[in-house]
């Protein structure tokens, strides 16, 4: 098996494992280790560099270098060590590393917990469930706010949890995929524009913006295509998805977050985003989409169906890409 075909095989098997297993609670996910490592380094960097603006900016660069470097060395080291024992063990380790980079089923499972609590009219339980998958303050959300938060998370993470990892795995295998995941984890932990992380997290946030630039836009166009495909009850509006994407794709502080959110809002014919509370402070945000109908809990299920459609199309494109590169390499 050539390197290209082996890469396609491990990525495809990892994708299929995620579809079946998701993120079982009994399996310790490497992202937790990365998160613990980031927290450990943050404390050390603050002590070593101090709390000045320039010091924290420099410390943020060091944080990025250490986290990405360590992630690359550890993931690459695992594959190298396994390869020394057996090619098949390396293959198995590669599949597992790729599998843990995807977040399709876990995203669906966690968002559907929100859906089920909303259907029971249990606002407190729904707030708690959505707090597990969003970074905003959830105690102030009403039923509509909880629903919107869940839909937005599914839409945004179609890129962060599927398209971007797949993009970097297709280029550099599981090691590059995990470097991306490390940057994305840093951004989710220290990439906030508040007093605590404005300077320390800037390097991580900027690098995350760069790494997600192409995948988020690729994912948005694939999601538009997915919205155009026939659906039961015509639940997706492909034409409106494209319209809202072209109009609202930059209605977010991040250059990438609104790319897929705008497509989802258009496809569902609802209005997402708007002002939100973070760490006890109200953050003013632009709306995404038109208020053509009220957001309802069923939109969480619809967003998940759009997530799955988009994910399978992306995997298909990856397979075609790797096969084409294999053919071209032999010409």
Task: Go through each PLM region and give its residues.
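Hydrophobic alpha-helical transmembrane segments
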Residues: 1-179, 183, 191-331
């Amino acid at each position: 098996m050539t390197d290209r075909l082996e890469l396609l095989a491990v990525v495809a098997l990892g994708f299929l494992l995620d579809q079946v297993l998701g993120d079982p609670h009994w399996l310790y996910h490497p992202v937790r280790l990365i998160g613990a490592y980031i927290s450990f380094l943050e404390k050390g960097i603050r002590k070593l560099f101090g709390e000045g603006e320039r010091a924290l900016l420099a410390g943020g660069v060091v944080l990025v270098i250490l986290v990405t470097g360590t992630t690359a060395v550890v993931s690459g080291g695992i594959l190298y060590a396994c390869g020394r024992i057996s090619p098949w063990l390396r293959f198995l380790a590669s599949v597992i590393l790729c599998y843990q980079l995807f977040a399709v089923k876990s995203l669906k499972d966690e968002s559907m917990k929100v859906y089920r609590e909303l259907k029971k009219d249990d606002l407190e339980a729904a707030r708690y469930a959505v707090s597990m998958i969003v970074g905003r303050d959830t105690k102030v959300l009403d039923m509509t706010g909880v629903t919107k938060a869940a839909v937005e998370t599914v839409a945004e993470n179609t890129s962060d949890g599927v398209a971007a990892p797949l993009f970097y795995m297709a280029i550099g295998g599981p090691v590059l995929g995990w470097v991306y995941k490390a940057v994305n984890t840093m951004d989710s932990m220290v990439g906030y524009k508040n007093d605590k992380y404005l300077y320390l997290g800037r390097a991580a946030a900027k690098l995350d913006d760069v790494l997600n630039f192409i995948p988020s836009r690729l994912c948005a166009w694939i999601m538009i295509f997915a919205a155009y495909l026939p659906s039961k009850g015509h639940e997706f509006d492909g034409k409106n998805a494209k319209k809202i994407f072209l109009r609202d794709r930059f209605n977010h502080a991040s250059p990438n977050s609104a790319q897929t959110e705008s497509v989802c809002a258009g496809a569902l014919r609802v209005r997402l985003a708007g002002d939100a509370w973070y760490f006890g402070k109200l953050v003013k945000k632009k709306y995404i989409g038109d208020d053509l109908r009220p957001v309802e809990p069923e939109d969480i299920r619809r967003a998940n169906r759009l997530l799955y459609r988009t994910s399978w199309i992306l995997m298909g494109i990856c397979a075609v890409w790797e096969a084409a590169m294999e053919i071209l390499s032999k010409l």
